[in-house]
Amino acid sequence: MKLTSFRVRRYKNVLDSTEVSVEPDVTTLVGMNESGKSTMLDALYRLNPVYNDTFVERDDYPRWRWKRDGRKEDLSVVTPIEATFELDQDDLVALQDALGEGVATPEAIVAGRRYNGERWIHVPVDEGRFLRNALDEHPCSCLLYTSPSPRD
């Protein structure tokens, strides 16, 4: 799995970084002093930190908007970091083993972390194919395919 891009929103002084591409060989963050380079890397680190490090809404949400935005929405479910990962062959095989053949064949997945600490992962899947695979493995699935319709 390889990081291909990330986006930081409503974290410290960064309202929306837009999508930042990560090149396979070298990626540089260039900007003036106090422009948010370290903030971007800090948010990316908190997606999956080595040591227990979570977002603290009161400290990490942009201060000048914290009170106003807090009246309008639940800030604990805001996602300050979102990253896109390209899957390698081993990852695709693991997905196939977990979900069944043909259910998930994404080239990339998107993962994020909310202020409340909840991580989420979006994997595009074919729900119909998943159900067909699950029914094929069930001993009574033959009844669903072979029984005549009530109108016959």
Q: Could you describe each region identified by the protein language model?
A:
Residues 24-26, 85-89, 115-117:
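Beta-strand elements of well-folded, non-transmembrane domains
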Residues 42-104:
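Conserved P-loop NTP-binding catalytic core
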